[in-house]
C-alpha cells in the first residue's frame, strides 16, 4: 500500500491562513512515520529554508510547493486556486519565478495573482494539483457543467502531461462528496491521475477556533458574524 503523504498544507507563513509551525509539523510527521511532507503556503517561500533544514534533520523528505491564485483571462475578479509542487531544481526555479512575478506584475487590491500565460512558460519540473472543489475543474463539477469541467481538466493535462492530478478529499466541507464522485468519474473518462489530499491548516482539532480567529482578523470580521463564510472545518 502506498504511504499517505500530505501534499496540501499551509504553515503560519501563509499569512492569510494556517497556524502550523515548522518544528511542530516535522515532529508530527516523524512521529507518524510519514516519509515526506509538502508545504504549499500561499504565494510565498518564506518558510522554505527553515522547512528544508528541519525536514532533512528528521529524515523526512521535504516537498516544496505553493498555492497560487490563477486569473481566468487575466481577470483577477475571475480567479481560482491552483497548487504547484516542485519535482526538481528546475521546478523550484519556475515556482520562484511565478511567485516573484505575482508580486511584481500580478497584484490586484494588494493580493498577488498569476496569469495562465505565465504558467505556460514555467511548466518544467512542476506538478499541478487541482485544489479539489475550490479549483476551476471542481467548481465546474459542482455547478454540474460537465463539458466545462472536461475542457478545463483537458487543458491542465495538456499543460502538465502526466503531472496534473485531480484532488480528492473529505474535509467535511459542503459539496465534498458531490465533488469527489464527480471528479472520480471525470478522471476515469480522461484517464487523469487522482491524488488524496487533506487541506491542512492546523495540526490539532482544538486549534480550530484559534485558526478561525486568525482568519477573521485577516478578513476584518467577527467570529459571531452570521454572514461570515465558513471555509474551514475541524
Q: Residues of each region from the PLM?
A:
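Phosphodiester-processing cores and adjacent nucleic acid-binding clamps
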Residues: 1-234
